[in-house]
Each structure stands twice: as C-alpha cells, then as structure tokens.
C-alpha cells in the first residue's frame, strides 16, 4: 500500500492544514503495481477487449438480424399499422437512446464489471421473451428492454479500454472493440435471411440467445473490474479493516460529496457534456447523421437488389457484405495507423488527443463519394457489383470516421469521463439510426435512387469540415469549455 504520510517528509514539524489533506492516501504500490489494470499482461488485456467486443457483436447483430423475419411476425400478429410494423425492428435501437445515459453514469461511479454482467443477464432473459412473445405489446416491450440492456457494453466499452491502456496504445484495442458495432449490422441481415428462409423469425432470437449466452459466460469467467477509482476504494477499505485507521482513503475518492451527490453528478455529466462541450456535441451529431444515413441506406437494399437485380431473400442479405468488406479494410487501416499518428512530441510532453482526428480528416469525403457512386450506379442498372462497391466505399469511410471520433473522446475525457462522452455519442447515434430510415420511402419515391442518394451525399459533405475544425481548434475548445469529471 502506498501511503502519503507527511510526518516522514516534514520531521519535527506539525503538518499544516494543506498537508493534512494528503494524509493517508491509498494509491498503487508504485508504477509497476500488478494490481493496476494498465500493468496487466497483454494477454489479459486483449482477453478483456475481446469479451467486450463479443458483447457488442451480439447486441448489434440482434439489431437487424430479425429484420428479414419482421414481415412474418407482422403477419403472425396481424399488425396492420405500418408504424407499428416499423417499430418491431426500430424499437430495439430506441433502447440504445435511453440506456447509455444511465449506464454510463453508473459505470463511472460503481465500476464496469457488475454492469456488464447485469446487462448480459437482462438481455438474455428478455431475448427469450422476444422469442416466446404471443402478441405485439409483449414483443415490443421485451424488444425495447433488450435494446436498453444491449446499450451497456456499447456505452462503457470505451471506458474499459481507457482503464486498460495508455493513450498511445489504444488504437488496436479500439479497432477490436469496433468490430462488433460495425460488423454486427452487416452480418445480421445475411444470417437473418438464411434463418428466416429455412426456419422462422423466432429462431433469429434463439440463435442470438445461444451466441450471447456463450459470450456472457466467457465474460463472467475471464473479466475483472478495471475502473481505477473502484479498485483503489476497495484497496482503501481493506487497509482500513487491516489497520483500524478510519482516515485512510483512496487517491481517487471525493470526500467532499455524499453518495447521493456523487450519483447526481454522474447522471448529469453526460447531459452536461452534450450541452456545454462543443467537441462532444459536434462529433456526436456528425456520427449520428452518419449512422442514420447508413441505416437509411439499408432501407434501399430490398428494392435495389430484390426488385431491380432479382436477388432472392438469401442473396439480398449477401448485398450487405460490400459494407462489411469496406469496414474490414477500414479496421485494418485504423489498427495500423491510429497509434502511429499519436506520436510522442519533442520535449517529452503528451501528444494531444486531436492527432486522433487525422484519419477522420482524410476519410470524411469517402462517405459522400460512396453515396453518389451507389445511387447513380443503382439507378442506371449497371452490373450489381458496381453499387456494392459503392457501399464498400461507404463502409471504409464510416469506420474511419466513427472509430477515430470515439477514440478521440476517450483520450480527451480520460478514464473517468470516457463512458459519459460515449454515452452521448451512442445515444444520439442510435436516435438518428432509428428515426432517419423513416425518411427513406418518401425520399426515394420523390427523387429516385440517383438524386435521393445525392441528397444524402450532400448532407455528408456538409460535415466534412468538422474534423478539420476540431483538429485545429479542439485543444482550445477543451480548455475553454472544461467538463467537471
């Protein structure tokens, strides 16, 4: 145990009030303390990141895996409202809007591990409920709760990576973490199409349930708490019992606030970031529009590949693989370049987090280019591979925008603020992902695929300056609009 005892540093003098504030502070036992998560072995750290990535994979897989089977559920439950029919898919994403704000706050107060386990248990229970639902109200309620629970790993995963890695080591870890959120929506329709075709819509939930149960059990066996304030508080509590010294406290503890005040501050922090920080607001809105545009793009696939190119239900799912290939290419670039760009400046000072945005600066035009490519090639009825290549370009750009943005927020707000910053990002992203696709049918009915996707491309172009501005002025904005962590 590391204790700061001023009597050893100021012999024959009485401690001043300032000295007393640092008496009996419990900290790590030096820089190499094996109990510090940042000193865990590479194997242990990687295992934790893979578990979190697995959590996000099944939670995002479930978002769209059911979509091919939605018409069958609509028929089974005799749903006549088009809005309710759309909600059978999108209400899951709405759970991602509300869940993050509470879960991020709790994780920054009580730790990460127990939240992962509770969210996994809730998710498993209500996925069973979805599979066994007998009416519309039951299904929608269970599906919404599943979405709220599934948002947990999405929200606090970035905080876990901040706990485990120094800033210059986070690139590859974030690339692993990003596999689930970005590949899940691509793989989901492929698997869902085959399952629905050969079994029924209920089996899309049973399949996700089996996968989620396996990953949840692995996480329960492998994972440990990573949040430094919780670990140091436990250490301080053990030392208070061992020594009988009630004055011992953790270095990270806030002795000036009550538990209720700390909880209130933690709950307010994400909303404060959204309202006060231009960085969080601008990046979250950019990511939200991009996420929403991608989900809106998905709404065109049945018409483009099913009607125009005469794909079967199974083949329609394969059309999503263009996005998947693009995202895999983006993952490779991000993993290779992200940490290299965060080079150590001269003089030994810490690299500024804005260096994370370099990839975002160069890749931001790719998404508009991809939408132009996809829209006009589909309208011209070129060979089916041409619009799929356009979606691959969108996939590369999407990954190289979303991941640098999230990693920048992690670096900028640190281990105690990362989850709150990502809660805002995830919440807005999910809101736009649920709402923007509703604009698809009227947009394409009036403008067709060419000009309809051109409108989306122009929206993407409007956001291209955002990473340029934040790269240049982000450090100034962080200092001018600080967030109390």
UniProtKB/Swiss-Prot annotation:
The keyword Transmembrane applies. Keywords: Cell membrane, Membrane, Transmembrane, Transmembrane helix, Transport. The chain crosses the membrane at residues 55-75, 83-103, 113-133, 144-164, 175-195, 203-223, 278-298, 317-337, 357-377, 384-404, 421-441, 449-469. GO terms for cellular component: plasma membrane. It is a multi-pass membrane protein. Pfam families: MFS_1 (PF07690). One of its GO terms (molecular function) is transmembrane transporter activity. It is found in: Cell membrane. InterPro entries: MFS, MFS_dom, MFS_trans_sf. Residues 1-22 are annotated as: Disordered. The keyword Acyltransferase does not apply. It comes from the Eukaryota. Its main location: membrane. MFS-type transporter; part of the gene cluster that mediates the biosynthesis of the trans-fused decalin-containing tetramic acid phomasetin. Belongs to the major facilitator superfamily. This is MFS-type transporter phm3. It comes from Pyrenochaetopsis sp. The gene is phm3.
């Amino acid at each position: 145990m590391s204790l700061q005892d001023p009597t050893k540093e100021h012999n024959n003098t009485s401690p001043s009030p300032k000295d007393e504030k640092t008496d009996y502070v419990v900290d790590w036992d030096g820089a190499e303390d094996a109990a510090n998560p940042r000193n865990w072995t590479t194997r242990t750290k990687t295992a934790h990141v893979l578990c979190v990535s697995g959590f996000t994979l099944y939670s995002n897989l479930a978002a769209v895996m059911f979509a091919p089977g939605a018409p069958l559920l609509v028929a089974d439950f005799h749903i006549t409202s088009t809005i309710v029919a759309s909600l059978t898919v999108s209400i899951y994403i709405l759970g991602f809007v509300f869940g993050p704000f509470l879960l991020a706050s709790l994780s920054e107060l009580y730790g990460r591990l127990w939240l992962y386990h509770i969210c996994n248990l809730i998710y498993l229970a209500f996925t069973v409920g979805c599979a066994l639902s007998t009416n519309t109200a039951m299904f929608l309620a269970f599906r919404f709760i599943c979405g709220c629970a599934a948002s947990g790993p999405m929200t606090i995963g970035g905080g876990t990576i901040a706990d485990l890695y120094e800033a210059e080591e986070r690139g590859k870890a974030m690339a692993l973490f990003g596999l689930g959120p970005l590949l899940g929506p691509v793989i989901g329709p492929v698997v869902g199409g085959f399952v629905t075709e050969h079994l029924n819509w209920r089996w899309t939930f049973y399949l996700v349930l089996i996968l989620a149960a396996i990953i949840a059990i692995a996480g329960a066996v492998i994972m440990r708490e990573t949040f430094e304030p919780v670990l140091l508080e436990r250490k301080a509590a053990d030392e208070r019992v061992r020594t009988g010294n009630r004055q011992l406290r953790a270095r990270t503890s806030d002795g000036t606030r009550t538990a209720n005040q700390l909880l209130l501050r933690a709950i307010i922090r994400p909303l404060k970031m959204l309202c006060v920080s231009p960085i969080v607001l601008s990046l979250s809105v950019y990511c939200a529009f991009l996420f929403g545009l991608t989900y809106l793009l998905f709404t065109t696939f049945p018409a483009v590949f099913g009607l125009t190119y005469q794909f079967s239900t199974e083949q329609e799912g394969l059309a999503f693989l263009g996005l998947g290939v693009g995202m895999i290419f983006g993952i490779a670039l991000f993993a290779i370049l992200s940490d290299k760009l965060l080079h150590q400046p001269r003089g030994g000072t810490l690299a500024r987090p804005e260096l994370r945005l370099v990839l975002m600066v160069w890749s931001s035009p790719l998404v508009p280019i991809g939408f132009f490519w996809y829209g006009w090639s589909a309208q011209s009825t070129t060979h089916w591979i041409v619009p799929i290549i356009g979606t691959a370009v969108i996939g590369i750009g999407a990954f190289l925008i979303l991941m640098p943005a999230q990693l920048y927020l992690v670096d900028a707000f640190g281990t105690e603020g990362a989850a709150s910053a990502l809660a805002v990002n995830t919440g807005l992203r999910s809101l736009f992902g649920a709402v923007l696709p509703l604009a698809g049918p009227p947009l394409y009915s009036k403008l067709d695929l060419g000009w309809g996707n051109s409108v989306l491309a122009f929206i993407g172009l409007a956001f291209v300056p955002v990473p340029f501005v934040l790269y240049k002025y982000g450090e100034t904005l962080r200092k001018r609009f600080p967030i109390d962590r």
